Amino acid sequence: MSKLSRKQQTQKRHKRLRRNLSGTESRPRLAVFRSNNHIYAQIIDDDAQNTICAASTLDKDLKASLKVNAGSCDASTAVGELVAKKALSKGIKQVIFDRGGNIYHGRVKALAEAARVAGLNF
């Protein structure tokens, strides 16, 4: 039996996690996607099937202010602060954190902690 690749392991974990995670209007889901070069965060209402707000290292205002590589922990911290600011402006304080099958470490952890410091509760 062949060993699963890291990507396959992540996808398997994400599928298992998503069985129990669902965002509502009162408590939407903060979903994180991490690629090799960038990180993306979305606040999603699964009941209405729409994205309330989103932020990533590709955002124009964030990209201009970043002095570091977009795949770094510092960039993830900036994305966490930005998504929290956008959510708070839309009246969202409580979210469910969806790490997207990634291990809670490094860039995913940096984004989550920055969002918490900026005012989101999860």
UniProtKB/Swiss-Prot annotation:
Gene3D superfamilies: 3.30.420.100
CDD domains found in the cross-reference section: Ribosomal_L18_L5e
The keyword Electron transport is assigned to this record: no
Region feature (Disordered): 1-27
GO CC terms of this entry: cytosolic large ribosomal subunit
Keywords for this protein: Ribonucleoprotein, Ribosomal protein, RNA-binding, rRNA-binding
Pfam families: Ribosomal_L18p (PF00861)
Cysteines paired by S-S bonds: none
SUPFAM superfamilies in alphabetical order: Translational machinery components
UniProt biased composition (Basic residues): 1-19
Biological processes, Gene Ontology terms: translation
GO molecular function: 5S rRNA binding; structural constituent of ribosome
Family of the protein in this entry: Belongs to the universal ribosomal protein uL18 family.
Function: This is one of the proteins that bind and probably mediate the attachment of the 5S RNA into the large ribosomal subunit, where it forms part of the central protuberance.
Subunit architecture: Part of the 50S ribosomal subunit; part of the 5S rRNA/L5/L18/L25 subcomplex. Contacts the 5S and 23S rRNAs.
Name assigned to this protein: Large ribosomal subunit protein uL18
Organism: Prochlorococcus marinus (strain NATL2A)
Phylogenetic lineage: Bacteria, Bacillati, Cyanobacteriota, Cyanophyceae, Synechococcales
Gene assigned in the entry: rplR
